[in-house]
Amino acid sequence: MDDANVPSLSGLPLLGAADRADPLFRRTAALAWSDRNPYFFAGAAARGIGGPHIGLDMIWPMSIVTHAMNSDDDAVIRQCLTWLKTTHGGTGFMHESFHKDDPTKFTRPWFAWANTLFGELVLDIVRRKSKLM
């Protein structure tokens, strides 16, 4: 099981604890982003990891951010950006979590931790994949 928070197994490269290209990390991330993780959810709005604190079917945007930051695949990064742009529930901010099928059902209308991590993602993409911005 992996949780959406950072630090998490999915966020190890962000902490410098693993290289995102390391085969062991890649397998760990693939497991976390699969149905084998009881807190991985896929719905009409997005796919991502949640956690036991909020309940089932609630995706944390932080998990989508870390997924994008751990990827070198332009299509994966674009998909993550699309999910992040379309799941703010009309507020323009990242939330703690949102429902996998209905992003207007969310927790915390403004969540500084997720907003800050999203800012880190923007800087990361500008440095690594500026053509995607």
List the predicted regions and their residue ranges.
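CBM-like carbohydrate-recognition segments
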Residues: G51-M133
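Extended ligand-binding clefts on enzyme/binding-domain cores
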Residues: M1-S63, N70-D72
